Amino acid sequence: MKFFALAALFASTVNSIAVDGLIPGARVIPANDVVALKKAGAYHQKHHHRRTVIIRSSSSDEDDVSADFLWGIKRANHGGRLLLQNGKKYVIGKKLDLTFLKDIEVQLDGELKFTNDVPYWQANNFYYDFQKSISFWRWGGEDIKIFGSGVLNGNGQRWYNEFAGQEILDPNNKYYRPILFVTENATRVSVEGITQLNSPCWTNFFVRTKDISFDNVFIHAYSTNASALPKNTDGFDTLNVDGLTVTNTRVDIGDDCLSPKPNTTNVFVKNLWCNGTHGASMGSIGQYPGVLDIIENVWIENVTLLNGENGARLKAWAGPDVGYGRINNVTYKNIHVENTDNPIVLDQCYFNINATQCAAYPSRVNFTNIVFEDIYGTSSGKRGKVVADLTCSPNAVCSGIRLKNIHLTSPAGSPPVIVCDGIQGDIGVECQSSSNSTTKRSVDLARSLKYRA
């Protein structure tokens, strides 16, 4: 009898410890309670069992669970997992600083949705000087895993409507829009399986981050208003990043599919699908006066680019008050383009600068050791017969530029035209100067229409 009494007392003590400090609607499942983990939806074949934290979900789009989410993150930190359950919605209406993380998993099977309270978010956010960027939240620390079958929803329609007709790089722009997912001072971050939907601005922005990977992610931005389409909803943007991997991912947005920015090194991309985008881009870099920018050691393979402005693109700023730097050791291999305005383009007259200004104040960003190999498909014909425009600045070095096995055609006619100006050495294929009278008309058309945003 004493044994059973002691056992009952022990069980009572354990239960009291387990619920101590819980907030309403929350619970914690021990890692060894496999039955409870399975019942809650926290059992995952690819991930080991962990102490799992569950928080209450939102009862409506007005039910902000930001405080619950932050509590859940803190409770799951240091070896646990926060589970956002399938079929449930979690509304975030307050900015969140999540830069204290260490060894945490977030299993997103439900929907994590931000409010569209524009006045609140424009007054309460995390601000970055680079291109006047803001975010709802920021994730930092080390060993952070986000996975699942759920949705991270930026709720961007109101932002699209109110930003219509404006430009992100307009120096007078004051309508700042949040980025959907931001890492800052983070190491070893992985995101797998989720959908990222309708970001108000860039979808992902990684700042001072090392070793971040995305696998099997779907990024999508669409508008229900034909006169207010999503703008600047880039798939991936970086700043001071070493080690970015993107694999088996689909991107259906209205801007760059991929766009590493200043001081990004060691990028690996494989099996990427992009629709309606501005290309798998390097840059832009060289924007800020006197600042050295670098992009280096990039491998991009097995990419499909459909119905877009650009395919494989490198872009650098020109003008009287810009920076300098280099894009070096970049390989594009096995790239399939269809109905794409500029299948291959080196753009050293970025952003919003005409040919006369660019000639007067050329770029100081070097493009070196750039390989385009096994590039095939069709242009849109919007740039005439030009399928590749490789034009370098007289102030910069363009060397080691190589094209191999290029099989691109244009519906505007044959033969397709590859333009090369200012490049040092043989590029490996026949190309023509833009001053050639037989190509000048197509080139002028291409450059007059070339996208500048």
Curated annotation (Swiss-Prot):
<keyword id="KW-0964">Secreted</keyword>
<keyword id="KW-0378">Hydrolase</keyword>
<dbReference type="InterPro" id="IPR012334">
    <property type="entry name" value="Pectin_lyas_fold"/>
</dbReference>
<feature type="active site" description="Proton donor">
    <location>
        <position position="255"/>
    </location>
</feature>
<keyword id="KW-0325">Glycoprotein</keyword>
<keyword id="KW-0732">Signal</keyword>
<feature type="glycosylation site" description="N-linked (GlcNAc...) asparagine">
    <location>
        <position position="329"/>
    </location>
</feature>
<feature type="glycosylation site" description="N-linked (GlcNAc...) asparagine">
    <location>
        <position position="302"/>
    </location>
</feature>
<feature type="repeat" description="PbH1 1">
    <location>
        <begin position="295"/>
        <end position="316"/>
    </location>
</feature>
<feature type="disulfide bond">
    <location>
        <begin position="392"/>
        <end position="398"/>
    </location>
</feature>
<comment type="similarity">
    <text>Belongs to the glycosyl hydrolase 28 family.</text>
</comment>
<feature type="glycosylation site" description="N-linked (GlcNAc...) asparagine">
    <location>
        <position position="263"/>
    </location>
</feature>
<feature type="repeat" description="PbH1 2">
    <location>
        <begin position="327"/>
        <end position="348"/>
    </location>
</feature>
<keyword id="KW-1015">Disulfide bond</keyword>
<feature type="glycosylation site" description="N-linked (GlcNAc...) asparagine">
    <location>
        <position position="185"/>
    </location>
</feature>
<comment type="function">
    <text>Specific in hydrolyzing the terminal glycosidic bond of polygalacturonic acid and oligogalacturonates.</text>
</comment>
<keyword id="KW-0326">Glycosidase</keyword>
<feature type="repeat" description="PbH1 3">
    <location>
        <begin position="362"/>
        <end position="405"/>
    </location>
</feature>
<feature type="disulfide bond">
    <location>
        <begin position="257"/>
        <end position="274"/>
    </location>
</feature>
<keyword id="KW-0961">Cell wall biogenesis/degradation</keyword>
<feature type="active site">
    <location>
        <position position="278"/>
    </location>
</feature>
<dbReference type="GO" id="GO:0047911">
    <property type="term" value="F:galacturan 1,4-alpha-galacturonidase activity"/>
</dbReference>
<feature type="glycosylation site" description="N-linked (GlcNAc...) asparagine">
    <location>
        <position position="275"/>
    </location>
</feature>
<dbReference type="Pfam" id="PF00295">
    <property type="entry name" value="Glyco_hydro_28"/>
</dbReference>
<feature type="glycosylation site" description="N-linked (GlcNAc...) asparagine">
    <location>
        <position position="354"/>
    </location>
</feature>
<dbReference type="GO" id="GO:0005576">
    <property type="term" value="C:extracellular region"/>
</dbReference>
<dbReference type="GO" id="GO:0071555">
    <property type="term" value="P:cell wall organization"/>
</dbReference>
<feature type="signal peptide">
    <location>
        <begin position="1"/>
        <end position="16"/>
    </location>
</feature>
<keyword id="KW-0677">Repeat</keyword>
<dbReference type="InterPro" id="IPR000743">
    <property type="entry name" value="Glyco_hydro_28"/>
</dbReference>
<feature type="glycosylation site" description="N-linked (GlcNAc...) asparagine">
    <location>
        <position position="366"/>
    </location>
</feature>
<feature type="glycosylation site" description="N-linked (GlcNAc...) asparagine">
    <location>
        <position position="436"/>
    </location>
</feature>
<feature type="glycosylation site" description="N-linked (GlcNAc...) asparagine">
    <location>
        <position position="225"/>
    </location>
</feature>
<dbReference type="InterPro" id="IPR011050">
    <property type="entry name" value="Pectin_lyase_fold/virulence"/>
</dbReference>
<dbReference type="GO" id="GO:0045490">
    <property type="term" value="P:pectin catabolic process"/>
</dbReference>
<dbReference type="GO" id="GO:0004650">
    <property type="term" value="F:polygalacturonase activity"/>
</dbReference>
<protein>
    <recommendedName>
        <fullName>Probable exopolygalacturonase B</fullName>
        <ecNumber>3.2.1.67</ecNumber>
    </recommendedName>
</protein>
